[in-house]
């Protein structure tokens, strides 16, 4: 009998975009997470289950072995790298860009640049690479407000269409990284359940 295989996924866009890949691997969820309160979803294989978690928590579940594989955004992985997991595949889904954005008509400032962002580690690494010292302000959402009320000079955030930036008088200025969702694996699980996991990887790869 095959070992139990647990796949960590988050609700919303990533789950929706991952469904065709799961189907290509003949893994069919038995319930719709958007309509169910269950956080552990059975599939058409009794030894394969889905763990529905927050997008930012998926790497943690995989790194600690609570899930064998999972899907996580590159933005999340850049913020919290772990020695216990590996990226297996760029799934080419949930694509966007991590960018610096600022007011269309930037005001002169005589202080060290203030950057509002949810992505503290990525922003810190980016500005360190440029040799520029900045003050980073941690926010969890509605980043676009910060420059409008002088909380920050610029923001570092994910940009998809750019419509939200435009609506708030901001423009993208600097590209930090291309973001997409990645298939990640727990290092120990990859050794002990290699065939099961590799079969899924190859089917995902063929469907991308």
UniProtKB/Swiss-Prot annotation:
Please provide one cellular component term from the Gene Ontology annotations of this protein.
Answer: cytoplasm
Can you supply a Gene Ontology BP term from the record? L-histidine biosynthetic process
Task: Give the reaction(s) catalysed.
Answer: 1-(5-phospho-beta-D-ribosyl)-ATP + diphosphate = 5-phospho-alpha-D-ribose 1-diphosphate + ATP
The UniProt keyword set, sorted, is: Amino-acid biosynthesis, ATP-binding, Cytoplasm, Glycosyltransferase, Histidine biosynthesis, Nucleotide-binding, Transferase
Compartments, as annotated in UniProt: Cytoplasm
Does the keyword section mention DNA-binding? no
What metabolic or biological pathway is this protein involved in?
A: Amino-acid biosynthesis; L-histidine biosynthesis; L-histidine from 5-phospho-alpha-D-ribose 1-diphosphate: step 1/9
Presence of keyword Zinc? no
Entry EC number(s) = 2.4.2.17
Its biological purpose: Catalyzes the condensation of ATP and 5-phosphoribose 1-diphosphate to form N'-(5'-phosphoribosyl)-ATP (PR-ATP). Has a crucial role in the pathway because the rate of histidine biosynthesis seems to be controlled primarily by regulation of HisG enzymatic activity.
Question: Which family is annotated?
Answer: Belongs to the ATP phosphoribosyltransferase family. Short subfamily.
Domain commentary? Lacks the C-terminal regulatory region which is replaced by HisZ.
Subunit text? Heteromultimer composed of HisG and HisZ subunits.
Listed name of the protein: ATP phosphoribosyltransferase
Q: Which organism is it from?
A: Hydrogenovibrio crunogenus (strain DSM 25203 / XCL-2)
Name of the gene encoding the protein in the UniProt record: hisG
């Amino acid at each position: 009998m095959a070992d139990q295989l647990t796949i960590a996924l988050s609700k919303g866009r990533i789950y929706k975009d991952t469904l065709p890949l799961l189907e290509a691997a003949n893994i069919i969820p038995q319930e719709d997470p958007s309509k169910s309160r269950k956080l552990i979803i059975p599939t058409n294989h009794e030894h394969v289950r889905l763990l529905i978690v927050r997008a930012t928590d998926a790497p943690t579940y995989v790194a600690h072995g609570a899930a064998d594989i999972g899907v996580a955004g590159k933005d999340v992985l850049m913020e919290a790298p772990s020695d216990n997991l590996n990226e297996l595949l760029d799934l080419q889904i949930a694509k966007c860009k991590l960018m610096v954005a600022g007011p269309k008509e930037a005001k002169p400032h005589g202080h060290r640049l203030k950057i509002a962002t949810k992505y503290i580690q990525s922003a810190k690494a980016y500005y360190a690479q440029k040799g520029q010292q900045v003050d980073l302000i941690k926010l969890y959402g509605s980043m676009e407000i910060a420059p409008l009320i002088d909380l920050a000079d610029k923001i570092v955030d994910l940009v998809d269409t750019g419509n939200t930036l435009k609506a708030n008088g901001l423009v993208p200025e600097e590209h930090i990284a291309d973001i997409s969702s990645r298939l990640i694996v727990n290092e120990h699980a990859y050794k002990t359940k290699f065939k099961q996991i590799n079969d899924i990887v190859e089917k995902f790869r063929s469907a991308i």
